[in-house]
């Protein structure tokens, strides 16, 4: 089974059971964004997490095995068409260079890890319209000289 087939089976089971990413994350003891990334095939899960998720979703051992397989990290390089994903693409396009400058002023020359990393999504109620709070928490990795 490949990661795409795994993803389709998980999404169908998730819908059939009426579960949210928060529900599934709470069931397996992981963060919702991380768990969703595993189910989309962009990360791999430890065996115990994969097995527990498959028990919750009533999926077989083949799905669990695919959840534990190392992924090929990559994505479609075209401009995103989904409006929400496009807004994130736009944020990086508009604010990426200034954000890089601010980070490097505070930390020096380097990068923010997406490996030693976590991400959280929160809903902030606001009378003018609820807001999305994204928290990206990555370890700073300085470039070294040799």
From Swiss-Prot:
Under catalytic activity, the entry for this protein gives:
cyanate + hydrogencarbonate + 3 H(+) = NH4(+) + 2 CO2
Phosphoprotein listed as a keyword: no
> Which family does the UniProt entry place this protein in?
Belongs to the cyanase family.
This protein is called Cyanate hydratase
What class does this enzyme belong to in the EC scheme? lyase
The record's listing under SUPFAM superfamilies reads:
Cyanase C-terminal domain, lambda repressor-like DNA-binding domains
Q: What InterPro entries does its record include?
A: Cyanase, Cyanate_lyase_C, Cyanate_lyase_C_sf, CYNS_N, Lambda_DNA-bd_dom_sf
Single GO term (MF): cyanate hydratase activity
Its annotated function is as follows: Catalyzes the reaction of cyanate with bicarbonate to produce ammonia and carbon dioxide.
Keyword list (alphabetical) reads: Lyase
Q: Which residues form the active site?
A: 87, 90, 113
Instruction: Give the record's GO biological process terms.
Output: cyanate metabolic process
The EC number(s) attached to this protein equal 4.2.1.104
Q: Which NCBIfam families match?
A: cynS, PRK02866.1
